Amino acid sequence: NIKDYYIERESTNCGNNVTYALRLLNEKNIEAKNIIIIQDTTMQHRMEAGFRKYDSNINIINYASYKTKVIVKEDKLTFEKNNILGMWDIERYISLLMGEIPRLNDNESGYGPNGRGYIAHVEVPKDVLDAFEYLKGEYRNLVRA
């Protein structure tokens, strides 16, 4: 039975989503044991890693705000069905996905402890890194810095 809920509305990036939400909880004297993250699907892993950086004892419940499937149609990537209100166009979606791998990778240019230090360590599977390298050849102009 939920009496009160709070929504952080000031942030403009994933890092501030985390720090501002934690600040809000602190201001309200709320000791959170569980946090539900509802975020753009493309940024779910990074958001969770951001919370883990600041408090590894909080149980993070990741809830993607949408689910979509990308298919090949007429030799181009497209959404299988896209009736999601406000959904990115396919190029922006690819750009968001392609931008996440370098951010999640815990190296000197990533966002983890061995890089910029914005998030907790994330172990990116080798097959994901291999797929990313392959896709960079096709979508180099869509990799966000």
Each language-model region and where it sits:
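Short acidic capping loops at alpha-helix termini that bridge into adjacent secondary structure
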Residues: 2-5, 32-34
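Short beta->alpha junction loops
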Residues: 5-15
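Extended hydrophobic blocks
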Residues: 23-34, 38-145
